Amino acid sequence: MKTKYSKDFEKSVRKLSGKTLNSVRNTILEVRNASCLDEIPDCKKLVGYDNVYRIRIGSLRAFFIFHIQIIDDCVFFKYLVPRGEAYDKKYEEKLRKDDK
């Protein structure tokens, strides 16, 4: 699958180091090598959203939007946030807006 990244996601990744950064890199490689969403480990569709999914990466959560297109399947990584912040209203509202 193709992958794209938001500025927020890229900014969060730049702040990482060590094992966490390697885990994020490995997850992105797994997504690129996957032919469907079922092949991505720890990937779950969020309840109440049409196209929003999350991947658990240790104590972090990567949220992405997946629109199935006839020509290309593309995973757009939107946010990478700590688990405690992942389900706050702030991100919930942002994801709802982006889900449309």
Residue ranges and their predicted role:
Residues K15, L46, I55-R56, H67:
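Short histidine-centered beta-strand/loop micro-motifs
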Residues M1-T27:
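Arg/Lys-rich, positively charged N-terminal/basic patches that mediate binding to nucleic acids
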Residues K2-T3, Y53-I55:
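Residues that recognize and position ribonucleotide moieties
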Residues I57-R61, I65-K100:
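Enriched for short, Lys/Arg-rich terminal
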